[in-house]
Amino acid sequence: MRLTIVPPQGFNEHIEQAHAIHQEAQVSPWKLSTFADCFSKPYYGVFAFDNDKIVGYAIMLEVVDEATLMDIAVDSGARGKGIGRALVDFVIETSVKNAMREMWLEVRESNHTAIALYESSGFQHIETRKNYYTVKNNDNGHDKSNGNSAQKENAKIMKWTNPTLA
């Protein structure tokens, strides 16, 4: 696997592959045009490749000295191979390099795998947003047992603090 910043050549082919992963991973995916906009300033996008196939992506927004991990996903057939870890490590390294004081993200309360990854990368749970995410009626990938209505799920808000600026 190689992690590569979005190259200007072949962007359309790459963005469509990444958008397919986004559509699979998200309950309410963005339109292709909205998704593509997130790979240009002020956003920062990166693709993870396995040979010539995109197997994951991350989108980050930097404003002044604060970053937000806007979206991250790994192709379902490529999970468990360290791609998510490589993407999170890359955005953290980018934040350190760009002197970001902190990075924020939100994650579904039921996404225990992602939460464990973020916590092991230094993110801390700061607060919970009640009934934040939409849940599909027959969405087997998400636990609806958090006490909310059948259509909503809580979001954990997590923060990483740059140790070089603390």
Residue ranges and their predicted role:
Residues H14, N111, N154:
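Acidic active-site catalytic centers that drive phospho-/nucleotidyl reactions
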Residues D37, S110, Y132-Y133:
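Positions that flank functional sites
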Residues A78-K81, R85, K130, A150-I157, ...:
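Acyl-donor (CoA/ACP) binding surface of acyl/acetyltransferases
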